[in-house]
């Protein structure tokens, strides 16, 4: 049995770090392992222009406590976003813009109601080389929550890719067999997808059978076992269009364990060990480096990291609770054994 592996330093291509005191509590866990992370812009108020993005970046760097961690900044697309906003953000170093369908997830009320309303913005993004990151769910009240992603593929994503064939798009945190198949069947190299640890480790039975487990509640919601298996097959395939994105989303314990609990799993703490466990279980540890360290950088057109991290197979127990401003936070797989960790 493999006891130690050394890989190129990984990156996290989908991360929430919030703001204020919470930011200071959660950034170090990511900075200890990952070289870079795509920072989600759904603050209150959202990050909608270059100046807000750069100010947010400065706050994250201050919380990284002297590491070489690089936050990669994004804009929150609204129906007031302009092509000039995109060009200014690109010039300032913003690498991507995020499409949140209005009402789809945490702090998405300012999102887009109809993607056609921002077609001029998408054209500007394609022209200047800014990536589009997509929360791939429709929000129509008559669409079942377990079907939102599938409908999005047909109704929104496919027409957008046709309209903008040079726009590079990341379908984030995919949860369905249909999404995995859509990415693998797409003709061209302009569509990629991130996969979270929770969607690879769990399905909706884990969340609902024997009692509701609120710390597994996230959006897009966990799906049937057949979808979990399809996601695992996708990463096992070695297809370079799939890459690591934790979607780590910190919420205080009392905000999760509530009558109307928040969506999101906090997975930044020990994240690379969670992925290593999954890849070991699938018998594909040799593919972890590409998934975690190469595929995302290559898709974004960024250089791969040049330093390395070493993982050792020394089982440890994920803490039941971690300190967080405003109350503790329960990490993904709390109280359970994780086999791999950073050396």
UniProtKB/Swiss-Prot annotation:
Its cofactor is Zn(2+). The keyword Transmembrane helix does not apply. InterPro entries: Amidohydro-rel (IPR006680), DHOdimr (IPR004721), Dihydroorotase_CS (IPR002195), Metal_Hydrolase (IPR032466). Pathway: Pyrimidine metabolism; UMP biosynthesis via de novo pathway; (S)-dihydroorotate from bicarbonate: step 3/3. Keywords: Hydrolase, Metal-binding, Pyrimidine biosynthesis, Zinc. It holds the Pfam family Amidohydro_1. GO terms for molecular function: dihydroorotase activity; zinc ion binding. Substrate binds at residues 16-18, 42, 135, 219, 251, 263. GO terms for cellular component: cytosol. The modification N6-carboxylysine is found at residue 98. Zn(2+) 1 binds at residues 14, 16, 98, 247. The active site is at 247. HAMAP family: PyrC_classII. Homodimer. This is Dihydroorotase. It comes from Marinobacter nauticus (strain ATCC 700491 / DSM 11845 / VT8).
């Amino acid at each position: 049995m493999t006891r130690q592996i050394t890989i190129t330093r990984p990156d996290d291509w989908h991360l929430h770090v919030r703001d204020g005191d919470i930011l200071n509590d959660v950034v170090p866990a990511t900075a200890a392992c990952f070289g870079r992370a795509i920072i989600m812009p759904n603050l209150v108020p959202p990050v909608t222009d270059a100046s807000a993005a750069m100010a947010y970046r400065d706050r994250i760097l201050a919380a990284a406590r002297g590491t070489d961690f690089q936050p990669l900044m994004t804009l929150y697309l609204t129906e007031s976003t302009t092509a000039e906003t995109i060009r200014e953000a690109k010039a300032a170093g913003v690498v991507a813009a995020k499409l949140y369908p209005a009402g789809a997830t945490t702090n998405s009320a300012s999102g887009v109601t109809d993607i056609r309303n921002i077609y001029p913005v998408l054209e500007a993004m394609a022209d200047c080389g800014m990536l589009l990151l997509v929360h791939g769910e429709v929000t129509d009240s008559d669409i079942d929550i377990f079907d939102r992603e599938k409908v999005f593929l047909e109704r929104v994503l496919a027409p957008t890719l046709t309209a903008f064939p040079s726009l590079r798009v990341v379908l984030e945190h995919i949860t369905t067999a249909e999404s995995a198949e859509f990415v693998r069947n797409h003709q061209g190299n302009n569509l990629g997808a991130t996969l979270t640890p929770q969607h690879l480790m769990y399905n909706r039975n884990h969340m609902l059978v024997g009692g509701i487990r609120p710390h597994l509640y996230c959006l897009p919601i966990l799906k049937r076992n057949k979808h979990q298996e399809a996601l695992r097959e996708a990463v096992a395939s070695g297809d370079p269009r799939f890459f690591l994105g934790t979607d780590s989303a910190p919420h205080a314990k009392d905000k999760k364990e509530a009558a109307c609990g928040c969506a999101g799993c906090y997975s930044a703490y020990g994240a690379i060990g969670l992925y290593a466990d999954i890849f070991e279980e699938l018998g594909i540890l040799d593919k972890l480096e590409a998934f975690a360290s190469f595929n995302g950088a290559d898709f974004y057109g960024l250089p791969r990291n040049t330093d390395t991290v070493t993982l050792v197979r020394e089982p440890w127990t994920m803490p039941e609770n971690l300190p967080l401003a405003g109350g503790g936070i329960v990490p993904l797989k709390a109280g359970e054994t994780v086999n791999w960790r950073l050396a």
